[in-house]
From Swiss-Prot:
Descriptive protein name: Myotubularin
Keyword Glycoprotein on entry: no
GO biological process per UniProt: lipid metabolic process
Signal peptide: none
Residues binding a 1,2-diacyl-sn-glycero-3-phospho-(1D-myo-inositol-3-phosphate), per UniProt: N287, N312, I313, S375, D376, G377, W378, D379, R380, R420
Keywords, sorted A to Z: Cell membrane, Cell projection, Cytoplasm, Endosome, Hydrolase, Lipid metabolism, Membrane, Protein phosphatase
Cellular-component GO terms for this entry: filopodium; late endosome; plasma membrane; ruffle; sarcomere
Organism: Xenopus tropicalis
Enzyme Commission number(s): 3.1.3.95
Length: 602
């Protein structure tokens, strides 16, 4: 049975996980030696030698379940043990062959999606590699073997339903929609207009359903410009869409041109609509050869086009590979800065943040509606709109608000999580894989470092989100769009990650958070102010980990607990003295006359 205690996910450094039994806090059922989730079953186990890059060879036993790989060491004090959700595994390779003669040269190499690699050596004479290789491959890549992802087998129960966090109509109403300029359309309720958009869309009030269909025919994958966010005061809008289908011949579409004019007119405060094309100019021009393109000045005289120079998914994938090479397993101190620079990872983070700042500033200060797109409108577009909304709207900086932001801008609007992450798929070399959502979370972390009191959630929250981006324990990030999720009945058959978060919110809460309404955040996106997220990218290396937990945060939490204890004792004293107050014939002028003073440090 699942316990009522909140599941936790271990995101501490490798040293912490190595030097103790796995206290990852999940809803555990004991299965002899290994901790299991409800619905998790042991598949196989074998004696192995873990080739630890930090402590050397460790004898132990590997256990494979339908959810995770679990290693438990032997003959070593303290105990070395760790677990890896199978969804985190990107590739499994055989190491060595029948002719291998070196010690520990025969076994398995496992490449993970979370910046670590694992190597296990086995004895050749036992012939145990074949079975464990086949079992690992089968359950790490279930979709490639006709099996269900673990999320559909997970039997965990939580006190709160995370699927209820986001309701499109509720979020629209929070933004003051519909109103005289904007309406909610049900044209996509059966995914007939655009199969990768959500069922409910917000469009200009004066645009008819027929107009929307004509515009869809001129936008890549029918992803028309629709509203993401509306400024509560100046009524400027953030719109998102895909590229226009201009092609080499420079095709035009009067309906699309008129539609963008209608968007410009909705707030009536600027003479031009700003279109932010996330791509480098040269890439946008090159896309004409495949039927795409961009909005030319001739066709859209009332629009200003700005290219943001953010590179495509392939460049980002290669950049992350280079970053992994320099952070795992060893960090070379003597060339660290030049090595980090050569990955270009922070440069890409800078460009994404810079683009989002431009979008936010144009809406808030320029009082202009904006249209944001890349090629298909589900990668760089999602990064820009969600980050700009995070800067503009303090609601999205709360825990629930951030969950709504992710559900809305990423999940409902069709970021291809399945393709970008490769859930349950053995094709590790798939060109569609790319760390787009990781970049977004990295940008959020950069903002939280610059504004430490502005976000209700803490770093542990962000790491937990990334861990379960890969784990396949929850249904939240599965599949490419809502259309497919509905067909697979994800909400009915799986648990939401937000259920886990809601179950013990205090673990994910920033103790320094100060609620501020209507404060716009403009982070500094220069290279001097950006940092490598060590607690995520290098967390598996015990030699280069930051102090855990943060001593200032820990002390603050202790003071908060002390304050809560004082408040509790004060309430108990009030209850104890209540009968005396009621029976007294003379009413004291203040509670202090009948109650002992309780002094707190606050």
């Amino acid at each position: 049975m699942a316990s009522n205690s909140t599941p936790k996910y271990n995101s501490n450094s490798l040293e912490n996980s190595l030097r103790r039994s796995p206290g990852d806090g999940m809803n555990h059922e004991q299965n002899d030696e290994i901790p299991c989730l409800p619905g998790e079953a042991l598949i196989t186990d074998k004696d192995v030698i873990y080739m630890c890059p930090f402590y050397g060879p460790v004898k132990g036993r590997i256990h494979v379940t339908n959810y995770k790989l679990y290693f438990k060491g032997e003959e070593m004090e303290p105990l070395i043990s760790f677990s890896v959700p199978l969804g985190v595994i990107a590739r499994i390779e055989k190491m060595g062959g029948a002719s291998s003669r070196g010690e520990n040269s025969y076994g398995l190499d496992i490449t993970c999606k979370d910046m670590r690699n694992l190597r296990f050596a086995l004895k050749q004479e036992v012939h145990s590699r074949k079975q464990i290789f086949e079992d690992l491959t089968k359950y790490a890549f279930p979709l490639s073997h006709g099996l269900l992802l673990f999320a559909f087998q997970n039997e965990e129960k939580f006190p709160e339903n995370g699927w209820a966090v986001y309701d499109a109509m509720t979020e629209f109403r929070r933004q003051g929609l519909p109103n005289g300029q904007w309406r909610i359309t049900f044209i996509n309720k059966n995914y007939e207009l655009c199969d990768t958009y959500p069922p409910l869309l917000v469009v200009p009030y004066s645009a008819s359903e027929e107009d929307l269909k004509k515009v869809a025919a001129f936008r890549s994958r029918n992803r028309i410009p629709v509203l993401s966010w509306l400024h509560p005061e100046n009524q400027s809008a953030i719109m998102r869409c895909s590229q226009p289908l201009v092609g080499m011949s420079g095709k035009r579409n009067k309906d699309d041109e008129r539609y963008l004019d209608i968007i410009r007119d909705t707030n009536g405060q600027t003479s031009k609509l700003t279109i932010y094309d996330a791509r480098p100019n040269v890439n946008a021009v090159a896309n004409k050869a495949t039927g795409g393109g961009y909005e030319s000045e001739d066709a859209y005289p009332n629009a200003e086009l700005v290219f943001l120079d953010i590179h495509n998914i392939h460049v980002m994938r290669e950049s992350l590979k280079k970053l992994k090479d320099i952070v795992y397993p060893n960090v070379e101190e003597s060339h660290w800065l030049s090595s980090l620079e050569s990955t270009h990872w922070l440069e890409h983070i800078k460009l994404v943040l810079t683009g989002a700042i431009q979008v936010a500033d144009k809406v808030a200060s320029g009082k202009s509606s904006v249209v944001v797109h890349c090629s298909d409108g589900w990668d760089r577009t999602a990064q820009l709109t969600s980050l700009a909304m995070l800067m503009l709207d303090s609601y999205y900086r709360t825990i629930v608000g951030f969950e709504v932001l992710v559900q809305k801008e990423w999940i409902s609007f069709g970021h291809k999580f399945s393709s970008r992450i490769g859930h349950g798929d053995k094709n590790h070399a798939d060109a569609d894989r790319s760390p787009i959502f990781l970049q977004f979370i990295d940008c959020v972390w950069q903002m939280s470092k610059q504004f430490p009191t502005a976000f209700e959630f803490n770093e542990h929250f962000l790491i937990t989100v990334l861990d379960h981006l890969y784990s396949c324990r929850f249904g939240t990030f599965l599949y490419n769009c809502e259309n497919i999720r509905d067909k697979e009945k994800v909400r009915e058959k799986t648990q939401s990650l937000w259920s886990l978060i809601s179950s013990e919110k205090s673990k994910y809460t920033n103790p320094f958070y100060t609620k501020e309404l209507n404060r716009v955040l403009y982070p500094v996106a220069s290279m001097r102010h950006l940092e490598l997220w060590v607690n995520y990218y290098i967390r598996w290396n015990p030699r280069i980990r930051q102090q855990q937990p943060n001593p200032v945060e820990q002390r603050y939490m202790e003071l908060l607990a002390l304050r809560d204890d004082y408040v509790r004792r004060l309430e108990e004293l009030q209850i104890t003295n209540s009968p005396k107050m009621n029976s007294s014939t003379t009413s004291p002028s203040s509670p202090s006359q009948i109650m002992p003073q309780v002094h707190t440090p606050f």
